[in-house]
Amino acid sequence: ILVDAQGRRFMTALDPAAELAPRDVVTRGVAAAIKAGKGAFLDARTALGAAFPQAFPTVYAACRASGIDPVRQPIPIAPAAHYHMGGVLTDSFGRTSIDGLWAVGEVACTGAHGANRLASNSLLEAVVFAARVAGDVGAAPLRRGWPPPAPPDLSPRPPPAEDAAAITRLRATMSARVGVIRDGQGLESALATIETIAAGARSPRLRAMTTAARLITAAALARRESRGAHFRADYPATDPAQSHRATAPFGPLRTVPPHPAQSLGEGLAAPPMETRS
């Protein structure tokens, strides 16, 4: 069960299913408890007790390394990013808007998950779409004569000191402004911070991170409703008129309105890079 610092369950007041409510509902409940200063804890003492080490050895070891004994103590918890349901726009065969480039897995937005992924469906998506992409790539004509591109230097190395500090700032901004509970003012503030960080980025890693952050934040700002894992405190209701995927071209991200999804068929003109939410 989930409890606050006083040992009181808080999900029972938020949803009839309590801790078994949809993951977005539970996540908002946890975030609200933490923001209110009550704290949030996973209490497995009754459900597992002495069986915890055998049932969840990895979690148990991590708790013990942090000085927590889950057999006798509730475990402090907080929301964390787990899965991104948006991504690069693809059709049902993983084709992107760039000819010859396919995307599959969490990087792609196939629409298979809707607004709130069901448990384990990401694995099913990866298996199904990987097979479809492989078949489509194998059937595609091989084009010759293109000069081989110079590979970028992506060898692992610590980022420059200024980039390391910027990464910390970017992560804090995304958690605070583009996290579980969002609003227009916070998203606008996040975009401004992201632009500042991007302007000083030196490493490919930070440039990629700011690109992803910009796209996610702009898409969240454009969707003026709450749906699944996307919750806007200033637009808490679900808008039936927005029951479709939205496309955010890579470019002027601050003013991109959502529009109905299209399939990337033959001859469809599409922006060179886009993401969906």
From Swiss-Prot:
Active site feature: 23 (proton donor/acceptor)
Coiled-coil segments: none
BP terms from Gene Ontology: 'de novo' NAD biosynthetic process from L-aspartate; NAD biosynthetic process
Cofactor annotation: FAD
GO molecular function, one term: L-aspartate oxidase activity
Domain of life assignment: Bacteria
Comp. bias regions, Pro residues: 146-161
Associated pathway: Cofactor biosynthesis; NAD(+) biosynthesis; iminoaspartate from L-aspartate (oxidase route): step 1/1
InterPro entries the record matches: FAD-dep_OxRdtase_2_FAD-bd (IPR003953), FAD/NAD-bd_sf (IPR036188), Fum_R/Succ_DH_flav-like_C_sf (IPR037099), Fum_Rdtase/Succ_DH_flav-like_C (IPR015939), NadB (IPR005288), Succ_DH/fumarate_Rdtase_cat_sf (IPR027477)
Predominant subcellular localization, coarse grouping: cytoplasm
The protein's Enzyme Commission number: 1.4.3.16
Binding site for FAD: 106, 122-123
Renumbered residue ranges of the record's region Disordered: 142-161, 234-277
Reactions catalysed: L-aspartate + O2 = iminosuccinate + H2O2
Cofactor: record remark: Binds 1 FAD per subunit.
GO CC annotations, alphabetized: cytoplasm
Subcellular location(s) of the protein: Cytoplasm
Record keywords, A-Z: Cytoplasm, FAD, Flavoprotein, Nucleotide-binding, Oxidoreductase, Pyridine nucleotide biosynthesis
Function, as annotated: Catalyzes the oxidation of L-aspartate to iminoaspartate, the first step in the de novo biosynthesis of NAD(+).
Family to which this protein belongs: Belongs to the FAD-dependent oxidoreductase 2 family. NadB subfamily.
Name under which the protein is recorded: L-aspartate oxidase
Source species: Rhodospirillum rubrum
Gene: nadB
